[in-house]
């Protein structure tokens, strides 16, 4: 018998926003939102920090009744005039999709001399990964990605949804947000373990650009271990394969690899690409079973709940997420410390190098007192 779908009552990520971020990863120059002026304002503004122009047709009550075709045609032409883009994305919103706007007709009428990725999406999907899938389907139709990459991305989206429903913020009707454990206490514990000569895994399983801050945790643990003379007791794992993912995602992996090397941090095990966070945990589990089953502790950053507990359940686990609703599920899985990098996402947009994390900064300061 199929499991009954739970009715989640805490706010969930938007498919519209997911489509916007996917267009960013495809390196569009302009993203046009066909909807009201305030739709997805926060994320649209943040994406401008990441190097793309986000504009809106600004549909009003009159357009909700009579349509916004002409506005979209005009904005496509205006975007070409202002920004001289090489690739344009257009994203639907709830009103434009409800009234049945034909975005493709507007593209045909404007006839820009550049490829256009049209994403017919609204926010009424239970899984925000629908927005990603629709954007990728349109990118495939436009010849921006090939069928092999599309199928790879589709598989990753299915696994990401599965992970969230099993162990993440979609695993129950309501999860209260939490700031997690005190970072000072967790830092003290990591330092104590290092001082005692315990063997530790430092695992980064990060989602795309969030890796710019989660990589700092890897960096900080290694810096402290080196200062204590126990760096050889650490094994670093990270999902930073620069050959995998959409263009922007591969670039993130290159930059993080560069910065870790510059600081003398060796990544002993590459566990996947930066979009493979839903499946990299299986690779981690296999590696631990084969080579690292006798290790004492693990510092896991990014998406810790995607790493199966089977081969880490006997280790002391210190995990760092950027999801306030992820604290309780991780605690219930068996993670002793769960920390939240609450302002991570805004700080990792528009950057091209590792950004200091709260836990990394805390660990460095506490180590000075040790």
UniProtKB/Swiss-Prot annotation:
Its cofactor is [4Fe-4S] cluster. Its EC number is 6.3.3.7. It catalyses: Ni-sirohydrochlorin a,c-diamide + 3 AH2 + ATP + H2O = 15,17(3)-seco-F430-17(3)-acid + 3 A + ADP + phosphate. It holds the Pfam family Oxidored_nitro. InterPro entries: CfbD (IPR017675), Nase/OxRdtase_comp1 (IPR000510), Ni-siroh_cyclase_CfbD (IPR052673). Keywords: ATP-binding, Iron, Iron-sulfur, Ligase, Metal-binding, Methanogenesis, Nucleotide-binding. One of its GO terms (molecular function) is ATP binding. It comes from the Archaea. GO terms for biological process: methanogenesis. Homodimer or monomer. The Ni-sirohydrochlorin a,c-diamide reductive cyclase complex is composed of a NifH homolog component CfbC and a NifD homolog component CfbD. Belongs to the NifD/NifK/NifE/NifN family. Involved in the biosynthesis of the unique nickel-containing tetrapyrrole coenzyme F430, the prosthetic group of methyl-coenzyme M reductase (MCR), which plays a key role in methanogenesis and anaerobic methane oxidation. Catalyzes both the six-electron reduction of the tetrahydroporphyrin ring system and the gamma-lactamization of the c-acetamide side chain of Ni-sirohydrochlorin a,c-diamide to yield 15,17(3)-seco-F430-17(3)-acid (seco-F430), the last intermediate in the biosynthesis of the coenzyme F430. This is Ni-sirohydrochlorin a,c-diamide reductive cyclase complex, component CfbD. The gene is cfbD.
